[in-house]
C-alpha cells in the first residue's frame, strides 16, 4: 500500500496557500498566496505536474542556507545542511503525485480578515515619486547584489549586517537592480502584513502597489520579531546603497 502525504489549504491574510505534508506531518513545501480557492486548487495541479518534470536544483545562498528550486519557479524552505535539503527534495518528488488534497474548510473569521486586508491595500497612486526621490535621506544599510547558481539575488542588510530580506532570483544584473527599485517603492507604500502559518512561523508579506508582486520576508518564531523586521525594512530599504561584491 502506498504511503501518502497530503496537500492542505490554508487561508491567510495574503491569500490561499497550499502546503505539501509528508505522511508524518513534516512540511515539505509552502506555496505563495492565491487570490481564490479555485486558484489554489489549480496551483496544486500545476505544482504536481512540475514535480513530475523533476527539474529540481539545490542552491546554497551566501548565508550558507540550502533550498531547492523547482522549475525555476517554486522555492523550497531553507535548510542549514545540504543533506537535509536533499532529503526534503526527494520527499517532495515522492509525495507530490499521489498526495490527497484535503478540501478547504470555510472559516468566516479568516475570510473576513482576508477581505479587509485586500480592501485596505494602498496603491501608491497619490505618491509624488519624484519628490520622494529628492528628499534628503542619509544612506543607511545596503542592498547587496550577488550572482548565484540560479541567477542574481539581492539582499537587504542593516548597518550591522543583519539580513532583512533575501530576494527571489533574477535572470540578469539589470533586472535584479530594477527589482530593488520596485521593492523600495513597495516598502515605501507599505502594504505589509504579518503572516502566521499552521506551524506558528511568522514572516512579513509585502505587496507592491499593484498587488501583483509579492515579497516574503524571513521566518521568525514570534510575531514581535516579524513586526520589528518590518520596521527595519521600512527604515533601511529607502536609503540603502546598492553594492556588487562580485565585481571586485
Which residues does each predicted region cover?
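Structured core of small recognition/catalytic domains
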Residues: 174, 188-191, 231-248
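Intrinsic disorder/low-complexity detector
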Residues: 1-15, 25, 49-64, 93-151, ...
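Amphipathic alpha-helical interaction modules
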Residues: 39-55, 184-188
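A structural feature that tracks compact, well-ordered secondary-structure segments
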Residues: 17-21, 28-33, 43, 59, ...
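C2H2-type zinc-finger recognition helix
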Residues: 37, 82, 173, 223-227
Amino acid at each position: 500500500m502506498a504511503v501518502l502525504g497530503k496537500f492542505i489549504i490554508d487561508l491567510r491574510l495574503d491569500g490561499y496557500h497550499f502546503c505539501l505534508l509528508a505522511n508524518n506531518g513534516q512540511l515539505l513545501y509552502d506555496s505563495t498566496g492565491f487570490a481564490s480557492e479555485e486558484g489554489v486548487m489549480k496551483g496544486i495541479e500545476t505544482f504536481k505536474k512540475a514535480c513530475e518534470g523533476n527539474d529540481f536544483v539545490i542552491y546554497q545562498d551566501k548565508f550558507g542556507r540550502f533550498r531547492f528550486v523547482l522549475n525555476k519557479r517554486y522555492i523550497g524552505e531553507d535548510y542549514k545542511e545540504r543533506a537535509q535539503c536533499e532529503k526534503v527534495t526527494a520527499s517532495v518528488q515522492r509525495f507530490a503525485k499521489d498526495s490527497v488534497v484535503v478540501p478547504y474548510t470555510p472559516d468566516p473569521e479568516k475570510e473576513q480578515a482576508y477581505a479587509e486586508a485586500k480592501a485596505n491595500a494602498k496603491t501608491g497612486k497619490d505618491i509624488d515619486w519624484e519628490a520622494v526621490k529628492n528628499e534628503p535621506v542619509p544612506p543607511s544599510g545596503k542592498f547587496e547584489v550577488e550572482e548565484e547558481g540560479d541567477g542574481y539575488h539581492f539582499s537587504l542588510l542593516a548597518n550591522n549586517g543583519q539580513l532583512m530580506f533575501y530576494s527571489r532570483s533574477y535572470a540578469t544584473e539589470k533586472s535584479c537592480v530594477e527589482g530593488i527599485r520596485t521593492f523600495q517603492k513597495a516598502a515605501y507604500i507599505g502594504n505589509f502584513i504579518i503572516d502566521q502559518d499552521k506551524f506558528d512561523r511568522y514572516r512579513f508579506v509585502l505587496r507592491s502597489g499593484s498587488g501583483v508582486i509579492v515579497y516574503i520576508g524571513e521566518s521568525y518564531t514570534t510575531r514581535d520579531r516579524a513586526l520589528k523586521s518590518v520596521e527595519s525594512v521600512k527604515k533601511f530599504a529607502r536609503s540603502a546603497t546598492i553594492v556588487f561584491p562580485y565585481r571586485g
